[in-house]
C-alpha cells in the first residue's frame, strides 16, 4: 500500500514519465502483476494507442487502460457481480418520470411542473448528483426535520426526497444504478486478489466526486501501489490558477492521513512538451502578477474575424497550409471550442476543404428521420391525428420510402390537406381524398390530364398505405394493457411496417457506397430503439399502464438516445470542447470562439438545488455536493490554461466581432492577458490580412474558385482588386485540372436578373389568341410585368391554406350585401334595427357554410370571427340606411356581371377592344352596385364598389391616369354602354364613381366623459362616407345629398359647398362630365397599351414604384423573380407623381363621342 503523486504544471513530463514507467515494466516482465491505468472515458482510446503504436512492445497482458466503470466490471468478473439488473440512463429517467406522475398530487413545490418532460430530466440529474456525493434519502429527510429553513427550500427538498425514496424503494433488490454499482465495487475491493497485486496509475483528472474519492481510497488501501498524476504546482491558495487540481490533492492528502500513509511526491518542473520559447513563456507567465514581456517568435497567433463562418473558413485554410507546407498530418492538429454553435459549422465547412475530422461529442438521435417518424407517430395518436404531427410523419419518408418521387407526392398531399383543413378522423374519410377533389386544388376549374390523374392516384394510394399503418399501430396499442404488451405491440408494429428490413437494406447500401458513418447511425438507431423497449419491459414488466402514459414514458426514453461514433480513420483532425477534450501533445492547436462570455463563460446554476441551498446544505449537514457556480467561475482560467497548453509547436486563438444574431462580441479578457505577455503579438484581422495577402485565400481548389468569383464581382463593380486574382483566373481557366465548374461560376458575374422577352408564337401559346381577362389582371401587369407573366403565363399558384384570407373576407361581405340588397330591392331606407339583425343572420346562415369548406364553423376562433362579421354587416347596413335616406339615387343592380357574350339577360355586354397586334381584348368582371337617378328623361348612374380594405377604398386619379387603377372607369364605361339592358333612358350620364369601405369603425376619445351615445352613433356612420369622383353637374350634386346647402360638407359623399353655393375645393372630389369621359376613353387606351405589351412578350422584373412603395411588399412571386434592390433597382419603373391628373387628362386630345351608348 504505497501512494505516489506526480505533481507539476502542464507539459512537464508527468504523463510521459508514467507511460515510460509502465512500458519499462511491460518490457521487463510481460506477464507480471497487473498494471491499471485509470483515465477519463474520452482519453482511454488515445492512451491505448500510445501502447499499441510503440514498436518496442511486442504485446503484453499486464496493462489495461480503464475508466472507473470499466474497472468495476473487471473486478466483478473476478469476485462476482451484483444480482440486480443495471439501469441505463434512459431506463432511470423513464422510471423517475413515471414515479413523478404517480406522486404528483403529493408534491408541494413541483406539482405544476410534474407533467413537463424537462422536469423529470432535471430530477434524474439531481438524484444522480446526490448519489455521486453519497447523499441518501435519509440524509435529506433528517436534514429537513432537524433544520429551520425557508418554506420554498423545505418544500423543494421534501419533493425531491419523496421521489428519491420512492425511486430507491422501486429499485431495491431488483435494479441498480451506475452510481450504486460503483458503491458495490467499493464493497468488493477487499475480495479481489487481482487488485491486491496491481500497480494503479490515475491520470487525466482534475476533479472527482465523493463516490470517486471513495473508490480511490479503496484502491490506495487494497492495491499494491497507486500513482496519481495532477496538473498543479501544489499551491493550495483558493484563488490559485490550479485551485481545482490542488483541491484534489488536498482530498488525497486527507485520504492518506485516514489510512495513516505518506504521499511520495515527485515534482516536475522542467518543461518538455513545448518546442519553442513562445509556448514555454505562455505556460509559465499566464498566471503571474508581474508580467515579463518577451518578443513573440510567431508560434502564437490571434485571429479576429467578423463572423463565426469566416473564422472557421480561415482555420480550415490554415490547416491546409500546415499539412502542405509544414508536413504535418491531420492527427497532429486539434480544434477546441466552447460555444456549441461551432459544432454545426465544423460539419458544414470542413468537408468543403476535404479535411477529415472527428468531433469528440455525443449527438442526440432525436433528429434522425427514423426517430422523428417514431416520435411523430406517437404524437399522432396522442393528439388525435392533428395535421402537424401527421405531416412530420409523412415527411420523414420512412413509411413512404417504397414510392418513387415520394417527397413530391407528400408535397401534393400536404397542399391538399392544408387547403381542405384535414385533421382528426377526417384523415380516414376516403371520400375526402377522392382524385376528383385534387383536380380543384388551388384552382377553380381544371381538367386533369392523364399524367396528373396517375400522380394523384399515387398520392391517394400513399396516403392510404400510411393511414393503414397508423391504424394498425393504434389498434395494436389500444389492445395492450401492460407495459410488456405495449412494448410487444410496438415492436410488432415496426415489423408490420417492415422497418427492420428497410433499415438493414439502407445500411448495406450506405456501406457499399463508403458512407460508413451513416450506416453506423442506422445500426445505432435500431439497437437504441430495441434497448428502450427492453428497458421498458425490464423496469415495468407486467405493470398495468394507460396507453397515454406508456407513450409519454417511451418518448422520454427516446430523448436519451445518443450516437456514439467511433473515428473512421486515425489520421484526422481532433475536435472537442475545451472542458472535456483530451488532445495532448498536438503540433498545432486552434482555440476558436475566444470571446468574452464564452471564455470565461458565465456559470449559472442549472440544477434543482441552487448554489445558496448547496452552501447551506454543506454548512449545516457537513455534506459536500457538486461545485457551486462561483467555484466553477474561479476555474475558468484553468480551463483556458489546459486548453492552450495542449500544443507542442503552435497555438492559434480566434474570436469573432459579431454574434449569430448580429450582436457585438468582445474579445476574451484572457486573450488580452496573453497579448500582454509578448512584444509584437499583434491581432490579425482576417479580412485585412487577406486584402494584403490575397494568395493566402488560395489554399483549396474549389473554395479558391468561390473566392475568385467574389473578387471578380468586386472588380466588375470598379472596386480595387489585387492583380493576383486576375492572374489566378487565367491560371485556373487554362488548367484542365482546375477549371471544372469555372464557367458556371463566371456566368453569375454578369447575372442581372433579366428575363427573356417572349416570342409572338409563345405569347399566343401562353395567353391564347384572344385575351379574356378581368380588370385586376391588367392592373397586375402595370404593377410588374413579371407578376403578370408568373400568374397568367406560367399560372403559378400559391398554396391555398385552410384559413381565412383577406380576399375571402371581401367575398363574404360582397355576397352578404348582395343577398340582403336583393331581398329589400335596394331600399335601405326601410331597414330598422330588428330587420337589419334578421337579414344579417339569414345571409350569414346562407353564405358562411360555403366559404372554404365551412371554414368559419371549424373552430371556436372562426365562430367568434363569424359573429364579428355579422356585427360589421349590421353597422354597414345602418350606414347604408343613413346614406339612402338623404340621397335621390336608388340602388338598382347588385353584383352585376359583364362579359363579351352575356350568359343571361342580367349580364352586361363588354365592348371588345383590339391590341396593336390585332388580338381581341375581352374584359369581364362584376360591378358591386349600380345606383340610378332619372330627371327630365336623363338617367344618372353611380358606380358603388365595396372594399374591405381601407387602402384600396380610395380613387387615386394619378393611378387612373397611368393605368394603375382601371376598375372604376371600366365599370362606368360598361354601364354607359348598356343603358337598354339596365332599363335606363336614352340619355345616360355618369354620376359618381364611389368606394364604400366595409369595416368596423373606431372612434377615439380622450376620456369616458367625452362619450355622447347619440353623437357616437352619428360619428360611426360618418366613417362610412363614400370616396371617389363625382360629376360636377348640379343635378348630380343635388341628388347625391339632398341636404346640401351653402357652407355644408356632406358626410355621405365627397362634396362640400362654399358660402356662395359653389363647390368647395377642399371638401369636394369632382370633375366635369367631359373630363370623366376623357378618363374613360384614356382608360380604354391604357387597356389596349397594356394588352399589346402582354402579347408583345414583356416579362421584365420591373415593379412600378409609386409613393416610395413597391408592389413587391405584397407579391407572392418574390421567390420566383428573385427581385433584388441592388440588382434590379435600375429597372424600377416610376411615373411623374407631381402631375395634376385632371389637368393632364384635359390636355389630351381624344376623338370620341361622349354620352349615350358608345
From Swiss-Prot:
<dbReference type="Pfam" id="PF21445">
    <property type="entry name" value="ADDB_N"/>
</dbReference>
<dbReference type="InterPro" id="IPR011604">
    <property type="entry name" value="PDDEXK-like_dom_sf"/>
</dbReference>
<keyword id="KW-0067">ATP-binding</keyword>
<feature type="domain" description="UvrD-like helicase ATP-binding">
    <location>
        <begin position="1"/>
        <end position="275"/>
    </location>
</feature>
<keyword id="KW-0479">Metal-binding</keyword>
<dbReference type="InterPro" id="IPR014017">
    <property type="entry name" value="DNA_helicase_UvrD-like_C"/>
</dbReference>
<keyword id="KW-0411">Iron-sulfur</keyword>
<keyword id="KW-0004">4Fe-4S</keyword>
<feature type="binding site">
    <location>
        <position position="1121"/>
    </location>
    <ligand>
        <name>[4Fe-4S] cluster</name>
    </ligand>
</feature>
<comment type="similarity">
    <text>Belongs to the helicase family. AddB/RexB type 1 subfamily.</text>
</comment>
<comment type="subunit">
    <text>Heterodimer of AddA and AddB.</text>
</comment>
<dbReference type="GO" id="GO:0003690">
    <property type="term" value="F:double-stranded DNA binding"/>
</dbReference>
<dbReference type="Pfam" id="PF12705">
    <property type="entry name" value="PDDEXK_1"/>
</dbReference>
<keyword id="KW-0408">Iron</keyword>
<dbReference type="InterPro" id="IPR027417">
    <property type="entry name" value="P-loop_NTPase"/>
</dbReference>
<keyword id="KW-0227">DNA damage</keyword>
<keyword id="KW-0234">DNA repair</keyword>
<dbReference type="Pfam" id="PF13361">
    <property type="entry name" value="UvrD_C"/>
</dbReference>
<feature type="domain" description="UvrD-like helicase C-terminal">
    <location>
        <begin position="269"/>
        <end position="583"/>
    </location>
</feature>
<feature type="binding site">
    <location>
        <position position="784"/>
    </location>
    <ligand>
        <name>[4Fe-4S] cluster</name>
    </ligand>
</feature>
<dbReference type="GO" id="GO:0046872">
    <property type="term" value="F:metal ion binding"/>
</dbReference>
<keyword id="KW-0547">Nucleotide-binding</keyword>
<feature type="binding site">
    <location>
        <position position="1115"/>
    </location>
    <ligand>
        <name>[4Fe-4S] cluster</name>
    </ligand>
</feature>
<protein>
    <recommendedName>
        <fullName>ATP-dependent helicase/deoxyribonuclease subunit B</fullName>
        <ecNumber>3.1.-.-</ecNumber>
    </recommendedName>
</protein>
<dbReference type="GO" id="GO:0005524">
    <property type="term" value="F:ATP binding"/>
</dbReference>
<dbReference type="GO" id="GO:0008409">
    <property type="term" value="F:5'-3' exonuclease activity"/>
</dbReference>
<dbReference type="GO" id="GO:0004386">
    <property type="term" value="F:helicase activity"/>
</dbReference>
<comment type="function">
    <text>The heterodimer acts as both an ATP-dependent DNA helicase and an ATP-dependent, dual-direction single-stranded exonuclease. Recognizes the chi site generating a DNA molecule suitable for the initiation of homologous recombination. The AddB subunit has 5' -&gt; 3' nuclease activity but not helicase activity.</text>
</comment>
<feature type="binding site">
    <location>
        <begin position="8"/>
        <end position="15"/>
    </location>
    <ligand>
        <name>ATP</name>
    </ligand>
</feature>
<dbReference type="GO" id="GO:0000724">
    <property type="term" value="P:double-strand break repair via homologous recombination"/>
</dbReference>
<keyword id="KW-0378">Hydrolase</keyword>
<keyword id="KW-0238">DNA-binding</keyword>
<dbReference type="GO" id="GO:0051539">
    <property type="term" value="F:4 iron, 4 sulfur cluster binding"/>
</dbReference>
<dbReference type="InterPro" id="IPR014140">
    <property type="entry name" value="DNA_helicase_suAddB"/>
</dbReference>
<keyword id="KW-0540">Nuclease</keyword>
<keyword id="KW-0347">Helicase</keyword>
<dbReference type="InterPro" id="IPR049035">
    <property type="entry name" value="ADDB_N"/>
</dbReference>
<keyword id="KW-0269">Exonuclease</keyword>
<feature type="binding site">
    <location>
        <position position="1112"/>
    </location>
    <ligand>
        <name>[4Fe-4S] cluster</name>
    </ligand>
</feature>
<dbReference type="InterPro" id="IPR038726">
    <property type="entry name" value="PDDEXK_AddAB-type"/>
</dbReference>
Amino acid at each position: 500500500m504505497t501512494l505516489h503523486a506526480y505533481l507539476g504544471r502542464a507539459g512537464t513530463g508527468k504523463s510521459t514519465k508514467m507511460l515510460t514507467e509502465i512500458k519499462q515494466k511491460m518490457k521487463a516482465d510481460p506477464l507480471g502483476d497487473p498494471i491499471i491505468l485509470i483515465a477519463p472515458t474520452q482519453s482511454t482510446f488515445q492512451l491505448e494507442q500510445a501502447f499499441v503504436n510503440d514498436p518496442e512492445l511486442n504485446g503484453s497482458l499486464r496493462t489495461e487502460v480503464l475508466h472507473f466503470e470499466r474497472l468495476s466490471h473487471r473486478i466483478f468478473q473476478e469476485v462476482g457481480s451484483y444480482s440486480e439488473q443495471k439501469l441505463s440512463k434512459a431506463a432511470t429517467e423513464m422510471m423517475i418520470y413515471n414515479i413523478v406522475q404517480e406522486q404528483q398530487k403529493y408534491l408541494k413545490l413541483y406539482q405544476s411542473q410534474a407533467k413537463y418532460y424537462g422536469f423529470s430530466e432535471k430530477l434524474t440529474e439531481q438524484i444522480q448528483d446526490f448519489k455521486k456525493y453519497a447523499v441518501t434519502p435519509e440524509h435529506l429527510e433528517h436534514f429537513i426535520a432537524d433544520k429551520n429553513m425557508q418554506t420554498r427550500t423545505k418544500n423543494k427538498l421534501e419533493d425531491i426526497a419523496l421521489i428519491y425514496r420512492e425511486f430507491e424503494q422501486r429499485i431495491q433488490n431488483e435494479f441498480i444504478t451506475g452510481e450504486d454499482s460503483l458503491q458495490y465495487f467499493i464493497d468488493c475491493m477487499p475480495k479481489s486478489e487481482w487488485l491486491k497485486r496491481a500497480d494503479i496509475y490515475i491520470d487525466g483528472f482534475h476533479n472527482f466526486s465523493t463516490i470517486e474519492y471513495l473508490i480511490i481510497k479503496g484502491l490506495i488501501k487494497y492495491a499494491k501501489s497507486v500513482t496519481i498524476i495532477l496538473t498543479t504546482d501544489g499551491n493550495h491558495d483558493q484563488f490559485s490558477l490550479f485551485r481545482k487540481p490542488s483541491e484534489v490533492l488536498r482530498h488525497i492528502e486527507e485520504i492518506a492521513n485516514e489510512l495513516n500513509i505518506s504521499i511520495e511526491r515527485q515534482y516536475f518542473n522542467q518543461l518538455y512538451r513545448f518546442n519553442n520559447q513562445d509556448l514555454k513563456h505562455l505556460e509559465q507567465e499566464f498566471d503571474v502578477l508581474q508580467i515579463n514581456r518577451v518578443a513573440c517568435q510567431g508560434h502564437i497567433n490571434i485571429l479576429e474575424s467578423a463572423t463565426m463562418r469566416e473564422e472557421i473558413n480561415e482555420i480550415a485554410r490554415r490547416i491546409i497550409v500546415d499539412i502542405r507546407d509544414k508536413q504535418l498530418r491531420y492527427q497532429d492538429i486539434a480544434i477546441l471550442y466552447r460555444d456549441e454553435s461551432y459544432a454545426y459549422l465544423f460539419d458544414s465547412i470542413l468537408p468543403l476543404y476535404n479535411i477529415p475530422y472527428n468531433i469528440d461529442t455525443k449527438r442526440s438521435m432525436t433528429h434522425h428521420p427514423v426517430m422523428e417518424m417514431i416520435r411523430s407517430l406517437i404524437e399522432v395518436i396522442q393528439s388525435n391525428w392533428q395535421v402537424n404531427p401527421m405531416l412530420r410523419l409523412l415527411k420523414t419518408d420512412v413509411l413512404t420510402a417504397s414510392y418513387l418521387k415520394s417527397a413530391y407526392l407528400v408535397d401534393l398531399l400536404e397542399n391538399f390537406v392544408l387547403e381542405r383543413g384535414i385533421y382528426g378522423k377526417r384523415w380516414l374519410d376516403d371520400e375526402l381524398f377522392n382524385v376528383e377533389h385534387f383536380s380543384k386544388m388551388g384552382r377553380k376549374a381544371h381538367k386533369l390530364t392523364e399524367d396528373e390523374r396517375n400522380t394523384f392516384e399515387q398520392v391517394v394510394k400513399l396516403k392510404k398505405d400510411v393511414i393503414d399503418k397508423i391504424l394498425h399501430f393504434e389498434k395494436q396499442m389500444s389492445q395492450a394493457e401492460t407495459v410488456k404488451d405495449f412494448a410487444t405491440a410496438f415492436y410488432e408494429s415496426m415489423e408490420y411496417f417492415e422497418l427492420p428490413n428497410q433499415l438493414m437494406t439502407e445500411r448495406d447500401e450506405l456501406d457499399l457506397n463508403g458512407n460508413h458513418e451513416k450506416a453506423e447511425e442506422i445500426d445505432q438507431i435500431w439497437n437504441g430503439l430495441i434497448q428502450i423497449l427492453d428497458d421498458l419491459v425490464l423496469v415495468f414488466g407486467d405493470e398495468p399502464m394507460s396507453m397515454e402514459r406508456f407513450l409519454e414514458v417511451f418518448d422520454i426514453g427516446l430523448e436519451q438516445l445518443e450516437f456514439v461514433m467511433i473515428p473512421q480513420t486515425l489520421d484526422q483532425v481532433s475536435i472537442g470542447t475545451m472542458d472535456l477534450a483530451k488532445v495532448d501533445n498536438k503540433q498545432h492547436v486552434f482555440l476558436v470562439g475566444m470571446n468574452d462570455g464564452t471564455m470565461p463563460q458565465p456559470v449559472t446554476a442549472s440544477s434543482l438545488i441552487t448554489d445558496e441551498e448547496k452552501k447551506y446544505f454543506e454548512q449545516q449537514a457537513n455534506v459536500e455536493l457538486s461545485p457551486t457556480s462561483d467555484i466553477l467561475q474561479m476555474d475558468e482560467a484553468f480551463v483556458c490554461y489546459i486548453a492552450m497548453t495542449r500544443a507542442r509547436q503552435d497555438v492559434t486563438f480566434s474570436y469573432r466581432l459579431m454574434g449569430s444574431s448580429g450582436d457585438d462580441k468582445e474579445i476574451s479578457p484572457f486573450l488580452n492577458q496573453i497579448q500582454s505577455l509578448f512584444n509584437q503579438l499583434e491581432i490579425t484581422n482576417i479580412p485585412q490580412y487577406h486584402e494584403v495577402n490575397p494568395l493566402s485565400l488560395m489554399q483549396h481548389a474549389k473554395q479558391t474558385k468561390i473566392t475568385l468569383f467574389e473578387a471578380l464581382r468586386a472588380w466588375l463593380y470598379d472596386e480595387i482588386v489585387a492583380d493576383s486574382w486576375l492572374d489566378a483566373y487565367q491560371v485556373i481557366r487554362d488548367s484542365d485540372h482546375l477549371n471544372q465548374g469555372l464557367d458556371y461560376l463566371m456566368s453569375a458575374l454578369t447575372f442581372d436578373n433579366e428575363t427573356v422577352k417572349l416570342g409572338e408564337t409563345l405569347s399566343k401559346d401562353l395567353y391564347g389568341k384572344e385575351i379574356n381577362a378581368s380588370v385586376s389582371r391588367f392592373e397586375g401587369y402595370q404593377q410588374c410585368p413579371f407578376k403578370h407573366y408568373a400568374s397568367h403565363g406560367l399560372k403559378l399558384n400559391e398554396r391555398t391554406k385552410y384559413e381565412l384570407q383577406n380576399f375571402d373576407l371581401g367575398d363574404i361581405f360582397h355576397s352578404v350585401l348582395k343577398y340582403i340588397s336583393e331581398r329589400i330591392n335596394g331600399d335601405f331606407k326601410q331597414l330598422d334595427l330588428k330587420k337589419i339583425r334578421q337579414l344579417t343572420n339569414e345571409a350569414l346562415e346562407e353564405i358562411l357554410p360555403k366559404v372554404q369548406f365551412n371554414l368559419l364553423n371549424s373552430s371556436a376562433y372562426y365562430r367568434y370571427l363569424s359573429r364579428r362579421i355579422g356585427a360589421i354587416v349590421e353597422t354597414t347596413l345602418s350606414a347604408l340606411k343613413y346614406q339612402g335616406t338623404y340621397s335621390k339615387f336608388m340602388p338598382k343592380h347588385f353584383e352585376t356581371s359583364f362579359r363579351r357574350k352575356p350568359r343571361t339577360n342580367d349580364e352586361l355586354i363588354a365592348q371588345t377592344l383590339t391590341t396593336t397586334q390585332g388580338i381581341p381584348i375581352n374584359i369581364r368582371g362584376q360591378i358591386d352596385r349600380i345606383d340610378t337617378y332619372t330627371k327630365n328623361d336623363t338617367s344618372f348612374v353611380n358606380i358603388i364598389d365595396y372594399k374591405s380594405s381601407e387602402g384600396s377604398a380610395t380613387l387615386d386619379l394619378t393611378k387612373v391616369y397611368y393605368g394603375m387603377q382601371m376598375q372604376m372607369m371600366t365599370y362606368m364605361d360598361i354601364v354607359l354602354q348598356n343603358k337598354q339592358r339596365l332599363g335606363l333612358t336614352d340619355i345616360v350620364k355618369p354620376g359618381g364613381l364611389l368606394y364604400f369601405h366595409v369595416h368596423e369603425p373606431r372612434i377615439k376619445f380622450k376620456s369616458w366623459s367625452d362619450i355622447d351615445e347619440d353623437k357616437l352613433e352619428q360619428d360611426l356612420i360618418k366613417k362610412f362616407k363614400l370616396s371617389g369622383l363625382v360629376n360636377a353637374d348640379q343635378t348630380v350634386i343635388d341628388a347625391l345629398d339632398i341636404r346640401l346647402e351653402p357652407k355644408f360638407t356632406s358626410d355621405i359623399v365627397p362634396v362640400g359647398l362654399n358660402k356662395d353655393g359653389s363647390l368647395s375645393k377642399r371638401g369636394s372630389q369632382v370633375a366635369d362630365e367631359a373630363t370623366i369621359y376623357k378618363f374613360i376613353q384614356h382608360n380604354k387606351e391604357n387597356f389596349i397599351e397594356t394588352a399589346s405589351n402582354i402579347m408583345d412578350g414583356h416579362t421584365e422584373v420591373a415593379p412600378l414604384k409609386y409613393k416610395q412603395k413597391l408592389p413587391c411588399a405584397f407579391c407572392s412571386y418574390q421567390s420566383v423573380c428573385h427581385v433584388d434592390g441592388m440588382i434590379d433597382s435600375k429597372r424600377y419603373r416610376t411615373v411623374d407623381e407631381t402631375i395634376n391628373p385632371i389637368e393632364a387628362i384635359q390636355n389630351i386630345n381624344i376623338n370620341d363621342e361622349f354620352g349615350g351608348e358608345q
